[in-house]
């Protein structure tokens, strides 16, 4: 990770990341796709709204775990296995406690959450059932994501890919069982998701127990240590808050769509799933630059970290341009894969065509944010995302939802507009940092 061809390292390390994200997205889309084939619009809406809430919770957990990936990566890069073991142990202790508290709180608040989402009346009970079952599975979701963050921190991006592959296969099979054969609709989708996550965690624990490596964990590593947790949270909390804020903006946009009726509500839910596929490459590049740059920073190779940023930006922008062009020609049949309702497909296609360009702009600020994470400067990403959400994404979405009743196309423009603001801020910060290397390279 800290020697050899930088471009090859980026490609080899990012491919398992990309496949992992693809499988994780497929995992989430299976619920929506299978419910869409066997259930009605109300079931599809229940799963799309419920899965959006679960996605928000998951990305916040992943964001918090970014602190572990970065700190473990720095320790490994500096060849300090004792410090790496301490980071791993404290990560496990902290996240297991967080997951139990989160599960209890969310189970109590499930109905208020469904109400806040302005869920259409026909989909309320299905959404409640879906979320209740998924909330019970939060400890498994947390366990999978912290195990993955630990493996990636030590430079292993392949094992998490295998773990999610197991979960994905199990989820698809269980969805067909619970939804197709047993007719459980939204509740069946949630059961499949929760059980599949549990299976994945069991498999990952078996791998950990059989694995022998240079990092040895001791009981003392699991005891909370103030400085270790502080360093993890210093990076993780801003990322968690940033990702949470972004997801809240998506939820707000979903509420705007829900208020337009069942057709637009289902359309927006489906497009968000498609967008999650388009964002696989930008997301994998962000994670790649975070992990690789962290190890190189730990090894004192700052120029190599910067070169890594150059390559991930090149890959991401090229990909974004290609995808944006393709989507303009295939939007209707693409949305139609997830619904049998022609009106939903047409409505969603307009939203997707304008939204697609966000793949370019968001891709740029994703890569720069990942670079900032590696230096412990995650607060910068929180700031630029907050500004873009407050100044563009939410107000523009609201304006479009009120003044353009016949099409979702203008609503889709809000996301790339917000990302453009983030890009401007990120580039400005990067240029400033380049002129103050002596300060930020010693963080």
Regions found by a protein language model. Give the residues of each.
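Signature of the first transmembrane helix
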Residues: 8-69, 73, 237-257
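Residue-level hotspots within pore-lining transmembrane alpha-helices
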Residues: 19, 23, 27, 57, ...
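Small-residue-rich hydrophobic transmembrane alpha-helices
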Residues: 44-104, 141-160, 254, 268-331, ...
């Amino acid at each position: 990770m800290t020697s050899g061809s930088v471009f090859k390292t980026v490609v080899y390390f990012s491919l398992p990341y990309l496949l992992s994200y693809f499988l994780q997205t497929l995992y989430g889309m299976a619920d929506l796709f299978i419910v869409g084939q066997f259930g009605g619009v109300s079931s599809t809406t229940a799963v799309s709204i419920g899965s959006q809430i679960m996605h928000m919770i998951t990305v916040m957990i992943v964001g918090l775990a970014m602190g572990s990936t970065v700190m473990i990566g720095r320790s490994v890069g500096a060849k300090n296995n004792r410090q790496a073991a301490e980071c791993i142990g404290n990560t496990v202790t902290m996240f297991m406690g967080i997951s139990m508290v989160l599960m209890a709180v969310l189970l109590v608040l499930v109905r208020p959450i469904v109400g806040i989402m302005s869920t259409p009346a026909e989909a309320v009970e299905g959404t409640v059932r879906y979320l209740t079952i998924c909330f019970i599975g939060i400890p498994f979701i947390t366990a999978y994501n912290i195990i993955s963050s630990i493996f990636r921190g030590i430079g292993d991006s392949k094992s998490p890919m295998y773990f999610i592959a197991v979960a994905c296969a199990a989820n698809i099979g269980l969805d067909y069982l619970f939804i197709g054969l047993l007719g459980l609709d939204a509740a069946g989708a949630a059961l499949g998701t929760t059980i599949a996550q549990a299976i994945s965690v069991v498999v990952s624990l078996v791998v950990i127990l059989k694995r022998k490596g240079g990092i040895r964990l001791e009981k003392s590593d699991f005891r909370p240590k103030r400085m270790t947790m502080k360093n993890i949270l210093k990076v993780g909390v801003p990322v968690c808050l940033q990702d949470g804020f972004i997801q809240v903006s998506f939820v707000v946009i979903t509420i705007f769509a829900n208020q337009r009726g069942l057709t637009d509500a289902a359309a927006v839910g489906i497009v968000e799933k498609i967008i999650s596929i388009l964002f696989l490459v930008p997301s994998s590049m962000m994670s790649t630059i975070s992990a690789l740059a962290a190890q190189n920073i730990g090894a004192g190779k700052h120029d190599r970290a910067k070169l890594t940023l150059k390559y991930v930006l090149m890959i991401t922008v090229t990909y974004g341009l290609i995808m944006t062009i393709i989507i303009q020609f295939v939007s209707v049949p693409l949305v139609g894969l997830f619904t049998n309702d022609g009106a939903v497909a047409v409505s969603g296609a307009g939203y997707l065509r304008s939204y697609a360009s966000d793949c370019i702009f968001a891709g740029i600020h994703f890569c720069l944010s990942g670079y900032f994470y590696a230096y412990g400067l995650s607060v910068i990403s929180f700031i630029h995302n907050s500004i873009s959400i407050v100044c563009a994404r939410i107000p523009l979405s609201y304006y479009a939802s009120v003044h353009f009743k016949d099409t979702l196309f203008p609503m889709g423009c809000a996301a790339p507009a917000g990302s453009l603001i983030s890009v401007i801020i990120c580039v400005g910060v990067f240029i400033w940092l380049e002129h103050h290397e002596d300060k930020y390279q010693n963080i």
